[in-house]
Swiss-Prot record:
Pathway: Sulfur metabolism; hydrogen sulfide biosynthesis; hydrogen sulfide from sulfite (NADPH route): step 1/1. This is Sulfite reductase [NADPH] hemoprotein beta-component. Component of the sulfite reductase complex that catalyzes the 6-electron reduction of sulfite to sulfide. This is one of several activities required for the biosynthesis of L-cysteine from sulfate. GO terms for molecular function: 4 iron, 4 sulfur cluster binding; heme binding; metal ion binding; NADP binding; sulfite reductase (ferredoxin) activity; sulfite reductase (NADPH) activity. Siroheme binds at residue 483. Belongs to the nitrite and sulfite reductase 4Fe-4S domain family. NCBIfam families: CysI (TIGR02041), PRK13504.1 (NF010029). SUPFAM superfamilies: Nitrite and sulphite reductase 4Fe-4S domain-like (SSF56014), Nitrite/Sulfite reductase N-terminal domain-like (SSF55124). GO terms for biological process: cysteine biosynthetic process; hydrogen sulfide biosynthetic process; sulfate assimilation. Binds 1 siroheme per subunit. It is an enzyme of class 1 (oxidoreductase). The keyword Oxidoreductase applies. Pfam families: NIR_SIR, NIR_SIR_ferr.
């Protein structure tokens, strides 16, 4: 151990089994191709169960019928989740029509699920349809490479519809970063696209033969919007503009929200400021952060392997100096920036290019034809006539982007006729959940299926206390992995067991503070009783413009989390 940093640069010890699996996989091939032809099981076996994640898929089963199938001596109804790589969430209407058709024809649930990482997922793909889905994506210029497991995941970019030039520049950087950090293995093309094996040996100059120690998430952020929740991510490029033109980025590193119940070595953490860099150094810096985490991240304990833990172990200054050394630059001081919100502006917004952008609220991102609200059909009909593109937001909503004045009435009519523009409360617009049951194998409590009716009850509490137009950033996540980003909410519910949640309070509206656990393992009625009391106090005692989370801290209801590595569990 050096005196310059608090812990070892590399954690010695027995490597986790995931490291063996990656090393023996022949650059992510495993025996996936052979397993595809095994009709005796609907799932993937052995290492392939985990290796398919590098190809953008998770093996799941329908937990609603798991016990019933076990009683019938049947294996679980295995089906895959597939997540598309879609940097910045931009998708053409031609691509949308293709994914709409695949969801209808080849998935169990028939839905498209928008995620809070600006992409879409298919749930319920049977094994026989796994290869066809990759080929369908490829046919319209998409893929699912590196959207799961130990790689740089889908790169997010602020869905800012009115600063069109700045958004266009930031979006281009999101795409460049995504491409630069992609794996170089030909396994994806060989297995799914039937491309010929070539004699040359695979090399992974950035990710290495065993890839990253853990998942890695990257964003490009355009202040004052923090819609992409930068503090949930390992590496964040905050856009700095002069006269409406992008000149460089502030770099923030080491955010992340996943924890393990009761494991005090795990904690949610906000990202740390490293400094400012001019545009021309962006890719070199991105690569340097990733390779530093590749070499220094903990490969013995996956629960402690993310960048946030590496940063705490070696020290921020040591990590930053190594990034500077590898990138060949010195960071300049952080340039001023501030965030004012992170919700989407639902409805029409006019961009500075005179095009219009229509943001549609999609509850929990689930696109399906509901009774009386055929959302999926409505979006398909819009896709057939819209000349621009769609943009998926990090709040699981959808923007019909770049609509000329002449098309505005036609598109709004389609949206209204299909229930896509039904009025909802500010509270509902600011509530979000992960998928959880019935498909997620990690789910401990309901989330997506729980949130709509729970939001009804929170709306009733706001109404009761005379503030029906107010909102509280509220999120539900079905397990402590935290996909619903509850650890950056003003009210965060984290699933503990069926019908039971940990209640976290004290985050803020702009997503820069981690909430602390207020009550543990409580029922919905307990949560509502607490919220009734606290919202009542907020309505009476708040200062002008004070959000619920800031109020709970100022009023002494909850202590703020100031240094998560040391005080998250206190």
């Amino acid at each position: 151990m050096s005196e310059k940093h608090p812990g070892p640069l590399v954690v010695e010890g027995k490597l986790s089994d995931a490291e063996r699996m990656k090393l023996e996989s022949n650059y992510l091939r495993g025996t996936i191709a052979e397993d595809l032809n095994d009709g005796l099981t609907g799932g993937f076996k052995g290492d392939n169960f985990l290796l398919i994640r590098f190809h953008g898929m998770y093996q799941q089963d329908d937990r609603d019928i798991r016990a019933e199938r076990a009683a019938q001596k049947l294996e679980p109804r295995h089906a895959m989740l597939l997540r598309c790589r879609l940097p910045g969430g931009v998708i053409t209407t031609t691509q949308w029509q293709a994914i709409d058709k695949f969801a209808a024809d080849n998935t169990i649930y028939g839905s498209i699920r928008l995620t809070n990482r600006q992409t879409f997922q298919f749930h319920g793909i049977l094994k026989k349809n796994v290869k066809p889905v990759h080929q369908m994506l490829h046919s319209v210029g998409l893929d699912a490479l590196a959207t799961a497991n130990d790689m740089n995941r889908n790169v997010l970019c602020t869905s800012n519809p009115y600063e069109s030039q700045l958004h266009a520049e930031a979006y281009e950087w999101a795409k460049k970063i995504s491409e630069h950090l992609l794996p170089r293995t030909r396994a994806y093309a060989e297995i799914w696209l039937d491309q010929e094996k070539v004699a040359t040996t695979d090399e992974e100059p950035i990710l290495g033969q065993t890839y990253l120690p853990r998942k890695f998430k990257t964003t490009v952020v355009i202040p004052p919007q923090n819609d992409i929740d930068l503090h949930a991510n390992d590496m964040n490029f905050v856009a700095i503009a002069e006269n409406g033109k992008l000149v460089g980025f502030n770099l923030l590193v080491g955010g992340g929200l996943s924890i393990e119940h009761g494991n005090k070595k795990t904690y949610a953490r906000t990202a740390s400021e490293f400094g400012y860099l001019p545009l021309e150094h962006t890719l070199a810096v991105a690569e340097a952060v990733v390779t530093t985490q590749r070499d220094w991240g903990n490969r013995t304990d996956r629960k402690n392997a993310k960048t946030k833990y590496t940063l705490e172990r070696v020290g921020l200054e040591t990590f930053k100096a190594e990034v500077e050394r590898r990138a060949g630059i010195k960071f300049e001081p952080i340039r001023p920036y501030e965030f004012t919100g992170r919700g989407d502006r639902i409805g029409w917004v006019k961009g500075i290019d005179n095009n219009w952008h229509l943001t549609l609220f999609i509850e929990n991102g689930r696109i399906l034809d509901y009774p009386g609200r055929p959302l999926k059909t409505g979006l398909l009909e819009i896709a057939k006539i819209h000349q621009g593109e769609f943009r998926i937001t990090a709040n699981q909503n959808l923007i019909i982007a770049s609509v000329p004045e002449s098309q505005k009435v036609k598109i709004e009519t389609l949206a209204r006729d299909h229930g896509l523009m039904n009025a909802v409360s500010a509270q509902r617009e600011n509530s979000m959940a992960c998928v959880s049951f019935p498909t997620c194998p990690l789910a401990m409590a309901e989330a997506e299926r729980f949130l709509p009716s729970f939001t009804d009850k929170v709306e009733a509490i706001l109404e009761k206390h005379g503030i029906p137009d107010e909102h509280i950033v509220m999120r539900v996540t079905g397990c402590p992995n935290g996909c619903g980003r509850a650890m950056l909410a003003e009210i965060g519910l984290v699933g503990k067991a069926p019908g039971r949640y940990n209640l976290h309070l004290g985050g803020n509206r702009i997503g820069t503070r981690i909430p602390r656990m207020y009550k543990e393992n409580i029922t919905e009625s307990d949560i509502l009783a607490s919220l009734d009391e606290l919202v009542g106090r907020w309505a009476k005692e708040r200062e002008a413009g004070e959000g619920f989370g800031d109020f709970t801290v100022r009023a002494g209801i909850i202590r703020p989390v100031l240094d998560p590595a040391r005080d998250f569990w206190e």
